[in-house]
């Protein structure tokens, strides 16, 4: 079980230090007088975030007039807190308990684009676990309660007919993907939902891949951009330029001549010791992203259904009302998608 007091204290300190960092960042920006500053938070570290790493390394944001600061946060709730308070303008993430819970409590947030409209990754376990039913009574590593890895895991368990409370499946909040992978490797937890890069690394060490969840028919709204509804309405040009940069990044990723640079960016983003360890992640990235980056209303609705079973406020949310795809529609009319 997660030690709630320790987790709450860590979350409080993380939020405090994060906001102090952003306050200093905004002060420096004001002094410099630079245009179109954007702070984008991200709580995950996997090949799903590769499009961000490449866009930064190749200067695509600056090409489109955006000075973007990518801030890695420990968990989704910290990123949502920053977005809700206006300390950041965008959050990269998937539909989760963190953002749906915040919206249910009054945060006016919307998905403005989605680059991955499916569950992706591996459920990895120690070799003694041979199939999903044997997860009963075991521990699973996650980044945080309510975060992306948690909801990925919950949706997969739901598909398998497993209920954590009934089946005595425990969650342990460990941190980002690299820490979770170490937790499985070292026996701290019995299993975890991991991105393909870390999943392949553990498989090479004898651990079992219980599922490649991309092959399971689970509707989902995956990695995309969230903004405050007011920001989406008042600054559509900024969102448009961020999306143009990310579309340039996708085109760069899919050009075979750029493989060495893409792998280098991915290895750096995933904190891999060797660039060659990003090879599997690179191959996955080639088939990972959507051609049309519309938010997935059905996928959002599926998570509302799951979480709404135990949260009345979330159950009352309407998926279609959590989307503002006006900028994406404009880009499609221009032929960019």
Show the residue positions of the predicted features.
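N-terminal secretory signal peptides that target proteins for export/translocation
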Residues: 1-9
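Bacterial N-terminal signal peptides
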Residues: 12-24
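Sec/Tat signal peptide C-region and signal peptidase I cleavage site
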Residues: 25-30
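Short, glycine-/small- and polar/acidic-enriched structural segments
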Residues: 31-186, 190-196, 209-213, 218-219
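Short polybasic/polar patches that bind polyanions
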Residues: 56-57, 62, 103, 158, ...
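Pocket-lining segment of extracytoplasmic ligand-binding domains
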Residues: 97, 178-270
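Secondary-structure end/capping motifs
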Residues: 233-315
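Conserved C-terminal helix/tail region of periplasmic/extracytoplasmic solute-binding proteins
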Residues: 304-337
């Amino acid at each position: 079980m997660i030690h709630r007091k320790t987790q709450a204290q860590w979350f409080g300190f993380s939020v405090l230090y994060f906001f102090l960092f952003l306050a200093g960042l905004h002060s420096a920006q004001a002094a410099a007088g630079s245009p179109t500053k954007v702070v984008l938070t991200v709580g995950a570290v996997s090949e799903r975030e590769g499009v961000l790493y490449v866009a930064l390394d190749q200067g695509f944001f600056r090409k489109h007039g955006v000075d973007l600061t990518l801030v890695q946060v420990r968990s989704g709730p910290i990123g949502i807190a920053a977005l809700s308070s206006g300390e950041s303008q965008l959050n990269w993430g998937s539909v989760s308990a963190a953002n749906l819970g915040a919206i249910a409590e009054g945060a006016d947030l919307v998905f403005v684009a989605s680059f991955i409209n499916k569950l992706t990754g591996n459920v990895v376990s120690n070799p003694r676990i041979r199939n999903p039913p044997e997860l009963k009574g075991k521990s699973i590593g996650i980044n945080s309660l309510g975060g992306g890895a948690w909801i990925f895991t919950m949706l997969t368990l739901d598909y398998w007919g497993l209920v954590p409370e009934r089946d005595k499946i425990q969650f342990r909040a460990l941190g980002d993907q690299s820490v979770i992978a170490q937790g499985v490797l070292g026996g701290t937890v019995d299993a975890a939902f991991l991105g393909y890069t870390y999943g392949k690394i553990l498989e090479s060490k004898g651990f079992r891949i219980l599922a490649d969840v991309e092959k399971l028919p689970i509707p989902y709204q995956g990695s995309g951009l969230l903004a405050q509804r007011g920001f989406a309405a008042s600054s559509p040009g900024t969102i448009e330029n961020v999306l143009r940069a990310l579309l340039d990044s996708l085109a760069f990723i899919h050009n075979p001549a750029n493989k060495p640079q893409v792998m280098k960016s991915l290895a750096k983003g995933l904190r891999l010791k060797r660039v060659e360890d990003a090879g599997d992640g690179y191959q996955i990235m080639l088939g990972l992203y959507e051609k049309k980056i519309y938010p997935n209303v059905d996928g959002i609705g599926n998570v509302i259904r799951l979480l709404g079973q135990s949260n009345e406020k979330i159950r009352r949310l309407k998926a279609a009302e959590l989307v503002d795809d006006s900028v994406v529609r404009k880009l499609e009319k221009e032929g960019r998608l």
